């Protein structure tokens, strides 16, 4: 069994209106590892950022991040603690 670690995952959406449904589907799929979620949008633009606190092993986090990154216009950055 792999050890779970705490991560902060930042998800940037270039056009949140177009990408929200696809991103939400991935977040729901991996919801068992998401501890907290905060979303903010850039006033005056369609950009948005979602910040997640995640408790997962490295393999699961990689799968999660890669699936989000495959959505056109979505960027993912991760910090491990």
Task: Set out the residue ranges of the language-model regions.
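Long, contiguous binding/interaction regions
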Residues: 1-81
């Amino acid at each position: 069994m792999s050890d779970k670690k705490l991560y902060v995952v930042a998800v940037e959406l270039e056009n949140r209106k177009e990408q929200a449904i696809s991103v939400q589907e991935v977040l729901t799929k991996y919801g068992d590892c998401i501890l907290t979620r905060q979303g903010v949008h850039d006033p005056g633009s369609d950009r948005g950022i979602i910040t997640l606190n995640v408790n997962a092993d490295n393999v699961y986090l990689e799968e999660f991040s890669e699936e989000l990154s495959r959505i056109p216009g979505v960027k993912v950055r991760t910090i491990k603690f």
